[in-house]
Amino acid sequence: MASEARGDKLWGGRFSGSTDPIMEKLNSSIAYDQRLSEVDIQGSMAYAKALEKAGILTKTELEKILSGLEKISEEWSKGVFVVKQSDEDIHTANERRLKELIGDIAGKLHTGRSRNDQVVTDLKLFMKNSLSIISTHLLQLIKTLVERAAIEIDVILPGYTHLQKAQPIRWSQFLLSHAVALTRDSERLGEVKKRINVLPLGSGALAGNPLDIDREMLRSELEFASISLNSMDAISERDFVVEFLSFATLLMIHLSKMAEDLIIYSTSEFGFLTLSDAFSTGSSLMPQKKNPDSLELIRSKAGRVFGRLASILMVLKGLPSTYNKDLQEDKEAVFDVVDTLTAVLQVATGVISTLQISKENMEKALTPEMLATDLALYLVRKGVPFRQAHTASGKAVHLAETKGITINKLSLEDLKSISPQFSSDVSQVFNFVNSVEQYTALAGTAKSSVTTQIEQLRELMKKQKEQA
């Protein structure tokens, strides 16, 4: 009875005793890796063709295997595939079903192939597809930020450092600051995709494939860019998983920052913007509440992604060479982060595209003290060394505070008492449009500079879209 219990395992021949039920539960991954069903079939079809070319399968056998795999694919797509208790993973499930459909010929499919090279191939195929979708959503978010910046380029609001009012900026400059960060994420994603695009299939358990399998044929069939150089490395390396999770971590840092900014700006204390009802929720007790749950969830999901990266790093750091069962942990991390990014990016795009800004409240929040730097720059343009100009401007701020007035209300005599370089044209300093318009250097908040940023980002997005 014990040996029969092992007979349905791909590895059961060597064992005489049955597996402990608790061990069965711990060992099984079919509950989540069935998401690999389609790519597992895709890989098996390619491998079957390579076996036929190598003379392991006859043409008739190949046709039966391909037909059976197509039937299994159809069952998965229709949601009628029946997973059995003995199916410990997606590879076992598909092979078991193939045998039910075409008989013992199914047993030839795994010739020279190990689940070690099979599973990493499946995961890479899954990630190739998923990362293309994520890339599309990411570029759409960047585009939404850029196009909104172009439309609302004339809106000016306070810029903050340390959450204290600092200098006037354009609302567009704020939007583009987040767009630029996301373009770096898009570039990083492109690099991850390059590393994923290396074929491991044909590496066997660790020593390679002894059956003269045409790996170039496999590469072409599965649309990989290149072939792995070393079989031991190919079946065990999960650098691409770590790189993907690292990319995701940085992306979520940027999205969390943007979410936090927008949450603050949406408070009644700031009143700079209002979120759409479509991306807000209410309170079960307080009828007046409109909560920015969409942004709060984006912010919180960052911690979830960070945890996935940390867990995989901990799994990998102590492993010896080649495959170890520890690597089974990679799939849940990848699936979870793929799902998280897919949802978060779409919600973020929805938030940005539908929020309403209050130009009036933004402009009301601008205060003369924010022009203290401009006052110092006024003196610099008069030939005063910056350190002296900075000190003079600070004294002007202090004098205004002492008098209980704003800095722009200081008389010319007051200013001259601080520096003789002040003259009647100093009044031009106390204008918020003039303030932002002086930052004409590349990357600045002047309208001309912001327009250049928009043009550059549009061009960059075009290139990244072509490479996606």
Swiss-Prot record:
Catalyzed reactions: 2-(N(omega)-L-arginino)succinate = fumarate + L-arginine
Outcome (variant: E296D): Loss of activity
InterPro entries: Arg_succ_lyase_C (IPR029419), Argininosuccinate_lyase (IPR009049), Fumarase/histidase_N (IPR024083), Fumarate_lyase_CS (IPR020557), Fumarate_lyase_fam (IPR000362), Fumarate_lyase_N (IPR022761), L-Aspartase-like (IPR008948)
Impact reported for K331Q: Loss of activity
Domain of life: Eukaryota
Bilayer-crossing regions: none
Listed result of changing D117A: 55% decrease in catalytic efficiency
List of catalytic residues: H162 (proton acceptor), S283 (proton donor)
Mutagenesis / variant outcome for changing S283D: Loss of activity
Outcome after substituting W11R: 97% decrease in catalytic efficiency
Effect the entry attributes to changing H91N: 90% decrease in catalytic activity with 10-fold decrease in substrate affinity
Positions of the record's site feature: Increases basicity of active site His: E296
Outcome recorded upon mutating N116D: 99% decrease in catalytic efficiency
Pathway where this protein functions: Amino-acid biosynthesis; L-arginine biosynthesis; L-arginine from L-ornithine and carbamoyl phosphate: step 3/3
Sites where the protein binds 2-(N(omega)-L-arginino)succinate: S29, N116, T161, N291, Y323, Q328, K331
UniProt-reported outcome of changing W11M: 99% decrease in catalytic efficiency
Secretion signal, residue range per the UniProt entry: none
GO CC, alphabetical: cytosol
Quaternary structure, from the entry: Homotetramer.
Purpose of the protein: Delta crystallin, the principal crystallin in embryonic lens, is found only in birds and reptiles. This protein also functions as an enzymatically active argininosuccinate lyase.
Protein name: Argininosuccinate lyase
Originating species: Anas platyrhynchos
Underlying gene: ASL2
